[in-house]
Amino acid sequence: MKKILYVATVAEHFYYFHLPCFKLFKEKGWQVDVACGGERELPFCDNRFKISIKRSPADKENLKAYKELKKIIRDGGYDIIHCHTPMGGILARIAARGERKKGTKVFYTAHGFHFYKGAPALNWLVYYPIELVMSAMTDCLITINDEDFAFAKKHLKAKKTVKVNGVGYNLSLIHI
């Protein structure tokens, strides 16, 4: 059985945007696991790992979340790790480094970069260098708008960069 792990800061992100994707993977025979914070119940998932990912890159509690996530990923034997939200994406991509060497694919969906034309300089100083480094740990970077797609293609280092209109999947990317 193929396995996918979704990672984000909070369960509400998945509840409001990704349940149809969970359902699709289940219908195709995949094991669907989720790692995130929050109490909301999530249908269509086999295992729910409650980890407390903080939104700030400087929050020291993210070190604990990273260690938990690394163990989940190492023990899970996932084919795909699909991460969302800035900190969920950062922690999952770092935690998955070893498994990528074994063939696990890491997807990151950028639901709008925090650095964009007209964004505060602080956003560029903090988030752009982080995403530049993280993109090198990304097999497929999924963007949802033209500005992010063009920027990512030109300046970031993901193996593959695609644009999806809104939230969803281009099924040709994952061959399920």
Set out the residue ranges of the language-model regions:
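Short His-centered aromatic/hydrophobic patch
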Residues: 83-89, 110
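Active-site proximal beta-strand in glycosyltransferases
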Residues: 3-5, 97-116, 131, 142, ...
